[in-house]
A protein has these predicted regions:
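Short, charged, solvent-exposed linker or helix-capping segments at domain edges/interfaces
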Residues: 98-103
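Non-catalytic interaction-recognition regions
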Residues: 1-97, 108-585
Length: 585
C-alpha cells in the first residue's frame, strides 16, 4: 500500500512538472510513512514541504496542488492537507480487504518485493579463524548475516553468502603447535603448555587424533623441544616464546611433519565449524580459502592495478600504498622488506576479486574490534577504480551471557568458555536465532539464558510462535465442529471486520511488506523482530477479546481469513529469521 501511494504521488508530481513545479523531482523525494495517530489518516507525506523551496511556493499551497493532481484510485478514501503542508491519506476500507486477499494469494511470497532490482550483493559473515569451535560471539554474527541475507533476498536483491576461511598465517601455526604439545603430553613427555597456546578440550581431542594418525612418529624428547627457548610468560614474552616453539617444532618434526599436524587440525576444526553452522540453519554459497586465494596470484594482480595507477611507492625497502590520498589515516605497507605480502594487501585484493566476480555491493559482517578496517579497505578499493560506497561493514557488538545474575566468562584461549554449540544445546536453535537479533547489531547484547528457556509469554520467541500455534488450534477446533473454512466467502465479507481489535489487526498485519523493506534498506533484522513481537501482541489481544468460530458464516470466515493471514505473516517472518513456526506448543 505504501508503494502504491508513492506511485500516486509521483503521478501527481509528473502532472505538475513544468507548471507548478519547475521540473520533475527525483523519485526519492517522495516519501510516504504510516501516521502515528489514526485521526491523521493511515499514511502521510511531507513531499510538499521538501519541494516548496525549489517550487518557490508556500508548502500548503503546493500540497493542495498535489492533492488536486492525484489520480483517482480505489485505494484512497480521501487525501487532505494538514498542518504546515503535510498530505494525509485515509485508505478506503477495501484497501485493507485487498491486502488481506494478497496475503492469502501470495502466501509464502507475501512481503517480497522488487526493491533491490536484482542487484548482486555478497554478504560475507562469520569468517572465524578455524582455530577452535565457534563461540557465542560468532553465533551473533551468524544469526545477523544469515537473516540479513534472507531479508535482502526477500527485498529483491540477488544475494550470495560467503565464508572466508582464515587458514593461512600465524594463528594456524599456534593451533598446530598447541595440538602437538598436547600430543607430546599424551606420549609421556612433560613440558609446560605455552601461555599463548589454545587451551580448550578440543585441543586434547586433536592430540588424540594425532596419536591415532601418526602413532609415535611425531614424538620428540621434551628436553629437545625446550632447549634454548626464551622464557614464556609471566617471566618472559609469550609472543616470542610461541614463535620460537613453532620454529622448534618445524625443526624437530620437519616442515612436512608440522604441515601434517596443521592439516589435520585445520580439517577437524573447519569440519566442526561447517557442521555447527549447518545445525544452526546457517548456509553459505561459497567457502573461500585464504591460502588458496593467496596462491592464486590475486594479490599480485591487485598490486599491479595499484602500481599502474601510480598509488604505490618504495620506502625503507618496503612497498607502500598511498592510502592517505584516499581517506585513510596513514599509508599502508603492502609488501614488507623481506618480500612478504601483508594482510592488508590480501584484504584489498580479496575485495577487488569480489567486485570482479560481479558483485555490485559488498557487505562484510565483522566483529566490533574491526572499526578501523573499513576505511583502509575502502581506500584500497577506490584506488583500484572501484566505488568506495560499494563496501559496507556492519560491526557486530559483543555478547554477554547471564545465568541469573551471574555473568558467564568467555574467551577462546581460556579453559572455560561457551561455544555456540553449547548455547544451542541449552536454549535451542530458535531461541538462539531470535535472541541474537532482539537488539540492533551495533548495541551490546545481554543474553538471558533463563528467559530464553522459559516456556511462558515473557519469552518473546515463545510468544510469537504461540500466535502461530494458536491459529492452528483454531482451525482444529473448526474441523472438530464439522465446519470448514471458505476463504472466498471470508475475503468477500472482510467489511465485517469492523471491531477495534480487527481494525488494529488489519493495520498491523499489512505493515509487513514495509517492515521487510525497512529492514533491508537499513540492514536491520531487529526491525523484523520488533514487528513480529508487536503483531503477536495485537493478535493475542484479539484472540482473548473475540470468538472466531461464530454462527454467522460470513463473519466466521472473515475472522478466520484474518487470523490465517496473521499465521501466514508470522510464518513468513519467522522463516526469514531462521526460526521455526510450530503448529502446536
Amino acid at each position: 500500500m505504501k508503494q502504491e501511494l508513492e506511485q500516486l504521488l509521483l503521478a501527481a508530481l509528473t502532472r505538475l512538472a513544468g507548471s507548478v513545479l519547475p521540473q520533475m523531482p527525483p523519485a526519492d523525494a517522495v516519501v510516504v510513512e504510516r501516521t502515528r495517530d489514526a485521526q491523521h489518516g493511515d499514511f502521510a507525506s511531507n513531499v510538499a514541504l521538501r519541494l516548496a523551496k525549489a517550487a518557490r511556493r508556500n508548502p500548503r499551497e503546493l500540497a493542495s496542488a498535489i492533492v488536486a493532481a492525484l489520480p483517482e484510485s480505489p485505494l484512497l478514501e480521501r487525501a487532505e492537507v494538514a498542518g504546515a503542508g503535510f498530505i494525509n491519506f485515509r485508505l478506503a476500507p477495501q484497501a485493507y480487504a485487498r491486502e488481506l486477499a494478497a496475503i492469502h494469494t501470495r502466501a509464502a511470497a507475501y512481503g517480497e518485493s522488487s526493491l533491490g532490482g536484482g542487484e548482486r550483493v555478497l554478504v560475507e559473515f562469520v569468517s572465524a579463524n578455524p582455530t577452535g569451535p565457534l563461540h557465542v560471539g560468532h553465533g551473533r554474527q551468524a544469526a545477523y548475516g544469515a537473516t540479513l541475507a534472507n531479508i535482502l533476498t526477500a527485498a529483491g536483491f540477488t544475494v550470495a553468502r560467503e565464508y572466508y576461511i582464515n587458514d593461512a598465517g600465524r594463528q594456524m601455526d599456534i593451533l598446530a603447535v598447541s595440538a602437538w604439545v598436547r600430543y607430546l603430553e599424551l606420549a609421556g613427555e612433560t613440558l609446560p603448555f605455552p601461555e599463548n597456546g589454545y587451551r580448550g578440550d578440543y585441543v586434547r581431542s586433536l592430540a588424540e587424533e594425532l596419536r591415532t594418525a601418526f602413532g609415535a612418529a611425531l614424538r620428540r624428547p621434551a628436553a629437545a623441544v625446550l632447549a634454548g627457548l626464551p622464557a614464556d610468560a609471566p617471566a618472559g614474552d609469550k609472543e616470542s616464546y610461541i614463535d620460537a616453539l613453532i620454529a622448534r617444532a618445524r625443526e624437530l618434526i620437519g616442515t612436512q611433519g608440522f604441515g601434517a599436524v596443521l592439516e589435520l587440525s585445520l580439517a577437524r576444526m573447519l569440519g566442526d565449524v561447517r557442521e555447527d553452522l549447518a545445525e544452526f540453519g546457517v548456509r553459505f554459497d561459497v567457502w573461500t580459502s585464504e591460502r588458496e586465494f593467496t596462491e592464486s596470484g590475486a594479490i599480485d594482480h591487485a598490486l599491479a592495478v595499484l602500481e599502474r595507477a601510480g598509488h604505490l611507492y618504495r620506502e625503507a625497502g618496503a612497498l607502500w600504498f598511498r592510502a592517505t590520498a584516499f581517506g585513510d589515516e596513514k599509508d599502508r605497507v603492502v609488501v614488507r622488506e623481506n618480500g612478504q605480502k601483508t594482510y592488508f594487501a590480501s584484504d584489498i585484493a580479496y575485495h577487488l576479486a569480489k567486485r570482479e566476480r560481479g558483485f555490485a555491493r559488498l557487505i562484510d559482517v565483522l566483529g566490533a574490534d574491526h572499526h578501523g578496517y573499513v576505511a583502509r579497505v575502502r581506500a584500497g578499493l577506490i584506488a583500484m577504480g572501484q566505488p568506495g560506497e560499494c563496501l559496507e561493514a556492519p560491526l557486530i557488538q559483543f555478547v554477554s551471557l547471564y545465568r541469573g545474575t551471574e555473568k558467564v566468562p568467555m574467551g577462546k584461549r581460556e579453559a572455560q568458555y561457551v561455544t555456540l554449540r553449547q548455547l544451542r544445546g541449552e536454549v535451542g536453535n530458535d531461541a538462539c536465532r531470535f535472541f541474537y537479533l532482539m537488539r540492533s547489531h551495533d548495541q551490546p547484547l545481554d543474553f538471558d539464558l533463563e528467559l530464553a528457556k522459559a516456556r511462558t509469554n515473557e519469552n518473546p520467541v515463545y510468544y510469537i510462535q504461540y500466535a502461530h500455534a494458536r491459529v492452528a488450534s483454531v482451525m482444529k477446533q473448526l474441523a472438530a465442529r464439522g465446519l470448514s473454512f471458505d476463504c472466498a466467502m471470508g475475503l468477500a465479507a472482510a467489511a465485517k471486520l469492523e471491531s477495534s481489535h480487527e481494525q488494529a489487526m488489519l493495520h498491523a498485519l499489512t505493515r509487513y511488506p514495509e517492515v521487510i523493506e525497512q529492514a533491508a534498506v537499513n540492514r536491520a533484522p531487529h526491525a523484523l523482530v520488533h514487528y513480529l513481537r508487536e503483531l503477536a501482541n495485537v493478535f493475542h489481544t484479539y484472540y482473548n477479546a473475540e470468538q472466531f468460530i461464530v454462527d454467522d458464516p460470513q463473519l466466521r470466515n472473515a475472522r478466520l481469513a484474518l487470523v490465517l493471514g496473521v499465521q501466514q505473516v508470522v510464518r513468513n517472518g519467522l522463516t526469514l529469521l531462521g526460526v521455526s513456526a510450530p503448529e502446536s506448543m
